[in-house]
């Protein structure tokens, strides 16, 4: 029996056919009672707790930093959860991540509702029992207190938190003058004359490490 066949047999039936990958030497750790859809991708240093549901098309990828899902977390269709070396992800118990929502390098508390299309960016913290409604954005390093509602399409910025409607672009920028997106997320100086050349080459080099990922499951069973 090959090592690949052995690894497949070691996986419980309810996620043995999912797309699971070892990345940078780390493998997903999935509770026996969690259910991962066959077309979901789980890659790298990811821990998924009891009773979690990860639906079709969802991607949970630990790219240098860990991802931890508590118990009874639901990740809906085509949602994205991504950690980086600089920003881990933690999602608390009984939280729902809606269809097409994304969490990048952020901490989300327990019993949080992230509606369809919601975005939570690097370094942000969303407190327990909060709601980030349809297409709303929690910006980098924002701190959303417990029980906060971020309205549909609005933008949450800063610590202490400020909430802005999307038409107030100048105020949103003014509320976060020290946030350096290229530097914080990609390690590239914003003022460099070839910013996008450096950004795409550096980030592409990091992403290229997925070429060495080891498949742990077969979507065909």
Stretch-by-stretch model annotation:
Residues 30, 34-70, 74-83:
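A positional/architectural concept
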